[in-house]
From Swiss-Prot:
CDD domains: HMPP_kinase (cd01169). It comes from Staphylococcus aureus (strain Mu50 / ATCC 700699). Pfam families: Phos_pyr_kin. Keywords: ATP-binding, Kinase, Nucleotide-binding, Thiamine biosynthesis, Transferase. NCBIfam families: HMP-P_kinase. Gene3D superfamilies: 3.40.1190.20. GO terms for molecular function: ATP binding; hydroxymethylpyrimidine kinase activity; phosphomethylpyrimidine kinase activity. Transmembrane segments: none annotated. The lineage of its organism: Bacteria, Bacillati, Bacillota, Bacilli, Bacillales. Pathway: Cofactor biosynthesis; thiamine diphosphate biosynthesis; 4-amino-2-methyl-5-diphosphomethylpyrimidine from 5-amino-1-(5-phospho-D-ribosyl)imidazole: step 2/3; Cofactor biosynthesis; thiamine diphosphate biosynthesis; 4-amino-2-methyl-5-diphosphomethylpyrimidine from 5-amino-1-(5-phospho-D-ribosyl)imidazole: step 3/3. The keyword ATP-binding applies. GO terms for biological process: thiamine biosynthetic process; thiamine diphosphate biosynthetic process. This is Hydroxymethylpyrimidine/phosphomethylpyrimidine kinase. Catalyzes the phosphorylation of hydroxymethylpyrimidine phosphate (HMP-P) to HMP-PP, and of HMP to HMP-P. The keyword Transferase applies.
Length: 276
């Protein structure tokens, strides 16, 4: 029997399953990798917004990570919501010990509802602790603005932001997601690496049900990197995956509903095999 590839997510929770660790694990499963999860924050949230946040003590995060790494090694790691500087330092310790493992950062700073999930000091700390270790960072436009200090209102500013991530912050790769810009009917993302810039375009779907898109997108990239896929191929798969998940949203909840994490499986005709 072939052992499955393992992807580890380190993030907050969502009891309604649309974002955070819950969304990541579903995305890993849909990509055919074994998912593991370490919780950083217990978040009371739903499709209407974030109601309460309880950040776990960094020692509790350390204990979870210790349990994982003392037993097995993931083939790729992603981080999502990390709300305290102490927790960032804890995670950095494990990443430094395992630098060969691909690392994806989804710099979760704002919920879809607009709720802030990270204070200013922690945002600054992110730039010095985790971003320089990342194989790829996946901010949306508001998050890229928070990190770079730019007002990103043009393609020229997107290019400038990408250069800041690569040349100044030190990330190996950065995808600036244009899904938050409503100027066109096309969702265009920009992948920056030391080798240059590549773009990805997909149809933009007119729907409010986009809760957890950033989590899902970065989780699929993580899963594909765990399989050994090159970054470009991983991003290409993630774009297809997220487009289908938005197109076939399950319309759950009374607010901004989640995407469909199993739409890609069904479209590919694999769901019947998995249910046997």
């Amino acid at each position: 029997m072939i052992k499955p590839k393992i992807a580890l997510t380190i993030a907050g929770t969502d009891p309604t399953g649309g974002a955070g660790v819950m969304a990541d694990l579903k995305s890993f499963h849909s990509c055919g990798v074994y998912g593991m999860g370490v919780v950083t924050s217990i978040v009371a949230q739903n499709t209407l917004g974030v109601q309460h946040i309880h950040n776990l003590n960094h020692q509790w995060v350390d204990e979870q990570l210790d349990s994982v790494f003392n037993d097995t090694l993931p083939h790729a790691i992603k981080t999502g919501m990390i709300a305290t500087a102490d927790t960032m330092e804890t995670i950095r310790h494990y990443l430094m010990q395992h630098e060969s493992i691909p690392y994806v950062i989804d710099p979760v700073m704002l919920a879809k509802s607009g709720d802030s999930l990270m204070d200013n000091d922690t945002k600054q700390n992110l730039q010095h602790t985790l971003l320089p270790l990342a194989d790829v960072v996946t901010p949306n436009l508001p998050e890229a603005e928070e990190i770079t200090g730019l007002t990103i209102d043009s393609e020229e500013k997107i290019m400038q932001a990408g250069r800041i991530f690569i040349n100044e912050i030190g990330s190996k790769g950065i995808i600036i997601k244009g899904g938050h810009s409503n100027d066109t009917d096309i969702a265009k993302d920009y992948l920056f690496t030391n080798e240059g810039v590549q773009t990805f375009e997909n149809e933009r779907f007119k729907t409010k049900h986009t809760h957890g898109t950033g989590c899902t997108f970065s989780a699929v990239i993580t899963a594909e990197l765990a399989k050994g896929r090159p970054l470009f191929e991983a991003v290409h798969k993630a774009k297809k995956f997220i487009s289908m998940s938005i197109q076939y949203t399950p319309e759950i909840g009374r607010g901004r509903g989640p995407v469909n994490h199993f739409a890609y499986l069904k479209k590919e005709g694999l769901d019947d095999e998995l249910s046997k």
